[in-house]
Regions:
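Conserved P-loop NTPase architecture
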Residues: 103-144, 148-321
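Alpha-helix capping and helix-coil boundary motifs
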Residues: 57-58, 67-70, 293-299, 306-308, ...
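Poly-acidic low-complexity segments
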Residues: 20, 24-25, 29, 34, ...
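Charged, low-complexity, helix/coiled-coil-prone segments
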Residues: 51-71, 193-228, 242, 307-309, ...
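ATPase nucleotide-binding head domains, primarily ABC-like/P-loop NTPase cores
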Residues: 311-508
Length: 508
């Protein structure tokens, strides 16, 4: 059995989408971020479909991250691998042509049709076998000089070399090459037993032959018939015995099926590679885009043991940088965007951010959301360092101030829908929620959400103008002995009271 390595999943699983998750990605402007990193419409759709649902398995995240690291550390690797996949595409095209050129070779002993078609198929399949083994040889050349660290590429490199070292592979290529080069529509014999023996699918139906290939006996009537007997070839002339012609036609058809099977098996690993390569095309482009914007960039680190961790140094809002570049193509957003350090440890509860308008609170919140999405996909993030814990659910609600409409009742309904499905370790982002009603009522609702988060084990990061939240939360934490204490931060201002766009974490 040939090993198949999936470039996207070390541990494949089903993806579950929810309406709340989809709505959250719209609030985070994820689609705009993806579209800002690539102009390819199909790639935009494929990436959004993949990363809009957070990948919960840490092994899958690091699987992708390490593969991408290999691509980034070996700049020519991606193009070389694309060239190999070009051979794979040619093989697939050859298989399709062979299938379209084929037909039923056997209709009856009285009437034979499709011989030319079957010979064409046999020659096409033989050529595909040769090309497939050549694809393995090219892959070995690509991988040999490179220092690849990811488990995925190490496994691919090993199985490619393992297959090429087999004597059977060398013999198979030689036989298939002879068949592909020699057979024509006028061919009067075919090699059969060697290929049949190698494939070990089932014995081709053979008649007992002597030195004259047209003297034969019916094997069903011959005593002591050995179906495993080695026969190099069988032959026929177009004007000769119809029964022998039928035998050869059936042998060709069976041989075609065997060759089709072996090509499909040999190319199967490269089919998986072909299906997953798009992700790394985007990842390489995203890293280049972040650098082009003048932002810091790194690959994320993920620890399966730690939960509720979000640690970034010099984190930036990628959407803001892309939007600035869109409005002024000559600007370098990294020169003016203020980076923030973010630390939320395993024992920290929810985070509440307060401060003046237009002081960077919403930017800070969106930075957390976008970095969590990208990091959890194994993609580069706009930060100097990044260490996260994966979440099963990432939910976001940005109200009228930033994204559209939102009355108090609608806000309560939308956020309640999220809270109905949120689970331990999840992340909920709220921007200016519950601002459309009286301060006291809104503050009570928000504090209840934060208390519920502490009791349930998920984290809520909330931007708010509501007064008295810290005092109210300390009362609830003491009264109900909540296992996590909320943290508080505020948008900093300078000595003149102007926003610095830095977010300062408060003590106490």
């Amino acid at each position: 059995m040939i090993e198949v390595v999936d470039l996207l999943y070390k541990n494949p699983h089903d993806i579950v989408r929810t309406p709340d998750q989809e709505a959250s990605m719209k609030h985070l402007l994820l689609e705009e971020v993806i579209n800002g990193a690539t102009v390819n419409p199909q790639l935009q759709r494929d990436i959004y479909d993949l990363i809009s649902v957070p990948e919960p398995d840490p092994e899958n995240i690091m699987w992708r991250r390490d593969i991408l690291d290999d691509f980034l550390s070996n700049p020519a690797l991606f193009d070389d691998l694309r060239s190999i996949l070009g051979i794979y595409d040619e093989i697939c095209k050859g298989m399709r042509n062979a299938t379209r050129g084929g037909g039923s070779a056997v209709v009856s002993k009285k009437e034979l049709t499709g011989r030319d078609s079957q010979i064409f198929k046999m020659r096409s399949y033989a050529d595909c076998i040769v090309r497939t083994i050549e694809m393995y040889e090219e892959a070995a050349k690509v991988f040999k000089p490179r220092r690849l660290m990811s488990e995925a590429f190490c496994r691919i490199k090993d199985f490619v070399n393992r297959e090429l070292r087999k004597d059977e592979t060398v013999k198979l290529k030689k036989l298939a090459a002879e068949l592909a080069e020699s057979i024509t529509l006028d061919t009067s014999f075919i090699i059969s037993m060697d290929l049949n023996k190698y494939f070990c699918v089932e014995d081709v139906e053979m008649l007992e032959l002597d030195s004259n290939p047209y003297n034969y006996k019916d094997p069903k009537k011959r005593e002591g018939f050995d179906p495993k007997a080695r026969i190099e070839y069988i032959g026929f002339d177009s004007i000769d015995d119809g029964q022998l012609r039928l035998l050869v036609e059936k042998s060709i058809a069976r041989l075609c099926r065997q060759m089709e099977h072996i090509v499909n098996e040999l190319k199967r690993p490269f089919e998986k590679i072909s299906r997953g390569i798009y992700f790394y095309r985007f990842g390489i482009g995203l890293e280049n885009k972040i650098r082009e914007l003048g932002l810091p960039v790194c690959l994320p680190s993920v620890d399966a043991e730690d939960k509720r961790c979000f640690e970034c140094s010099s984190a930036c809002d990628l959407w803001l940088a892309m939007n600035m570049k869109k409005n002024d193509r000559y600007c370098v957003p990294g020169d003016s965007i203020v980076a923030n350090d973010i630390y939320l440890g395993p024992t920290d509860g929810s985070l509440v951010i307060t401060g003046k308008n237009n002081a960077g609170k919403t930017v800070f919140l969106r930075t957390i959301g976008i970095i969590q999405v990208l990091a959890q996909a194994g993609l580069p993030v706009p930060a100097e360092t990044c260490y996260i814990s994966p979440v099963h659910g990432l939910y976001a609600y940005f109200t009228a101030m930033d994204t559209g409409n939102g009355r108090f009742e609608d806000e309560v309904k939308s956020i309640s829908s999220m809270l109905d499905i949120v689970s331990e370790g999840d992340l909920v982002l709220l921007n200016e929620a519950f601002q459309s009603t009286a301060y006291e009522e809104a503050a009570d609702v928000l504090c209840n959400v934060l208390a519920y988060a502490a009791a349930s084990g998920f984290r809520c990061v909330s931007v708010t103008h509501l007064p008295g939240i810290k005092e109210h939360m300390r009362e609830l934490e003491g009264e109900f002995r909540l296992p996590f204490r909320a943290k508080f931060a505020e948008a900093a201002v300078d000595s003149e009271g102007k926003p610095t766009h830095k977010i300062d974490f408060l003590r106490g």
